[in-house]
Structures are given as C-alpha cells and as structure tokens.
Amino acid sequence: MDVGLTVLDHRLLSEEPWPNGSLAVMELPLSADQRTVLRGRRRTACGRDVLLQLPRERALMPGDRLTDAHEQVHVLVTAALEELLRVEAATPLALLEAAYHLGNRHVALELHEDELLLLNDSVLETMLKGRGLKLTRCCRSFMPEGGAYIAHQHA
C-alpha cells in the first residue's frame, strides 16, 4: 500500500453528524458500476487518491458518507456523470416492450414512467432504433434498478 494513501473503511449513518464537527468533506464521484465494488483505489473530485476497504454489505449510494478508522478524512459519495442512452417510445406498451427486451439481455436500466436510461452501447442502440424507439445520448448520473440479484456484491 502507498504511504499516505487514505484507507476508507467505515460508513457513517446518514443521520450521524460528521465526526469531530468536520466541515471539510471531499466528494467521491463514482459510476453505477464503481458503486458496487467496495474495495480498491479511487480518486476524489479534488484529486486525492483513497483506498476503499469497506465491509461487504450493500452497494454504495449517492449520499453515503465514508471515513477512515481515525475519523480524520470525511468523504461523501456522489453519482458520477455517465454517457447514457435515453429511450422514449410513442406508447407506454412500446416502452414496456423495450424494457422487456433489455431485461432479457441483463442490461442495467434506470426506469422512469416515460423513459428508460441505460449505459451507451452501440449494439443496443441499433436494436432499439430498429424497434422504432426515440434515442437520445445524454450525460447524467445513472441509478439503475437493483434487479433480481440486488443482494449480490462484488469485492
């Protein structure tokens, strides 16, 4: 391990105050995939390298608060911006059919009443266009549904 590399190994409950009355909090922007991996090197928004060594519990979520064993470093998890495809349909049934076909391919989806969001993928883009759906590329935070294996964690 690098000398001076901060190890983040504790989660704070959202209702707990920051330790030591801290006002200096670093942000840790993570993609949806990165939020499922609870161990490994990451870089904060201000460029500081940190090492996650969190217990294998649930995935990280935007708003989660992390600290080191000595409560000297305070980090707020945020959702990184990701290149996404926004899927819209002329009818609710067409959107439901798109979600069904993407689900059959185990594609991570963020579901909304009038749109689906998925990571940008040229093969899926071609398939969806072939179904007559309206696609727009966008850069947003991505909060996909947990799916059937939500309890499964990577480490």
UniProtKB/Swiss-Prot annotation:
Family membership noted in the UniProt record: Belongs to the UreE family.
Key words of the record: Chaperone, Cytoplasm, Nickel, Nickel insertion
Protein name listed in UniProt: Urease accessory protein UreE
InterPro entries the UniProt entry points to: UreE, UreE_C_dom, UreE_N, UreE_N_sf
NCBIfam families in alphabetical order: PRK13261.2-2
An annotated Gene Ontology molecular function: unfolded protein binding
GO biological process, one term: urea metabolic process
GO cellular component labels: cytoplasm
Domain of life, source organism: Bacteria
Upper taxonomic lineage: Bacteria, Bacillati, Cyanobacteriota, Cyanophyceae, Synechococcales
SMART domains noted in UniProt: UreE_N
Main function: Involved in urease metallocenter assembly. Binds nickel. Probably functions as a nickel donor during metallocenter assembly.
